[in-house]
Amino acid sequence: MANKKIIGNLGEDIALEYLEKLGYTLIERNFKGKKTRGEIDLVMTKGVVIVFIEVKYRRQGSFGYAACSISDRKKKKLYETAEEYLIEKGLSFNQKCSFGAVLIDDTHYNREISFIEDIFI
């Protein structure tokens, strides 16, 4: 389990650096919803928009490509946890929000990073 956490943190570090270069600002990392028991990897802003980011990091030999691991169930959990985040932080449901994903496929020879700005389209 510790190895999975280390790998997850590495993926989040890579994603955070990538998004900051694109002009995003970190608000919170690893928000855990008590009610939903979900987790949001990165909560960021760009302008006035709060962006909830799911990070998927896959190394060579692991279970398929990163993009294949964002299921409808995961999207639903992300949305519900974002609602919980807004409530916990006292923010309005009128707050502009979006949901993105950073997909990282890492091999010994190459690292591919993709950013999906809206995973619900």
UniProtKB/Swiss-Prot annotation:
Instruction: List the InterPro entries hit by this protein, alphabetically.
Output: Restrct_endonuc-II-like, tRNA_endonuc-like_dom_sf, UPF0102_YraN-like
Q: Sorted alphabetically, which Pfam families does this protein's record hold?
A: UPF0102 (PF02021)
Q: Which domain of life is it from?
A: Bacteria
Give TM segment ranges.
none
Under Gene Ontology molecular function, one entry of this record is: nucleic acid binding
Concerning its family, UniProt says: Belongs to the UPF0102 family.
- Extract the NCBIfam families matched here: PRK12497.1-3, YraN family protein
Q: What is this protein called?
A: UPF0102 protein BHWA1_02005
What organism is listed for this UniProt entry? Brachyspira hyodysenteriae (strain ATCC 49526 / WA1)
